[in-house]
Amino acid sequence: MANRGGCVTVAAEEMDELRRRNIELSREVAEMKTEMIKLWQRTVVAEEAEEQLCSQLAELEVESLEQARDYHDRMLFLMDQISRLSSSSVVSSS
């Protein structure tokens, strides 16, 4: 009978250890859930920031393209003016 009592004691100790471990694991799971929620929230913020930056970049690309076209048009205009002035000065010199 002593052995049975010993088995019962061991089983009770094992149960207590399993309960403690279960509580510990439950706490760890709760902490991990909290951390996961924080990471998810940061991910959402980062995605929103990325979208905003992409939008701003697209606007800047459009603006720079417009400026490049304006610059190109201005260069063509000035080259035409120089060409006209050069040809008119040649005609005037003759």
UniProtKB/Swiss-Prot annotation:
Q: What induces or represses expression of this protein, per its UniProt record? A: By stressful environmental conditions such as salt stress, AgNO(3), and sulfur deficiency.
Q: Which UniProt keywords apply?
A: Coiled coil
Q: Which GO terms describe its biological process?
A: cellular oxidant detoxification; cellular response to sulfur starvation; response to salt stress
Please list the coiled coil stretches. 8-35
Keyword Coiled coil listed: yes
Q: What InterPro entries would the database entry show?
A: LSU (IPR039282)
Q: Pfam families, alphabetically?
A: LSU
Q: What is this protein called?
A: Protein RESPONSE TO LOW SULFUR 1
Tell me which species this is from. Arabidopsis thaliana (Mouse-ear cress)
Whichever gene encodes this chain, its name is: LSU1
